[in-house]
Amino acid sequence: YSNSSYDIVSKNDKIYIIPGGKSLTGDNSFNKAGSVMIYDYEKWSVLEPSVVQNKLNTWPKDYTSIVVTKNDTEKEIIYVSSFGYGLFQFIDREPSAVYNKTNSPLENAHGNEGFYCRVDGLAFDKEGNLWMTNSEVSKAIKILDKEGKWHSLSVESLNGKYTINDI
């Protein structure tokens, strides 16, 4: 458990909390280990960072936003954005994917190598598409549609900006 909660959401009679954050001074992180804490009104459960690292070969940290949905087969899908590590996906509380510049249109800030895939502002539209912001890049709005296809939008007033938050 953590006393460093950064985002909280209530969905499906559960409460989901993530520690994390982002710096306003330009450095990459607060170095908060990425866990997802879930309270189902009876008990707490935690999706531990070590499990994510072992399964996805990426250390999760500096989470910035969380959204929860269900897929067509009623499996719980959790998406968590990170300020440096991209977008994490959990299916039925198991780490299933991390999206970054190697496997999606998500970009690293200013084309830097390493852990600069700065994602925030997760939100679903009424069709079930996942929208997000991608800071300090040429196309600041990214969309993962319900079919699993990625789309990028260029919004001149947002492109290249630091710490874009919610959509």
Predicted feature residues:
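Carboxylate-rich, polar loop motifs that coordinate divalent cations or form catalytic acidic clusters
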Residues: 1-167
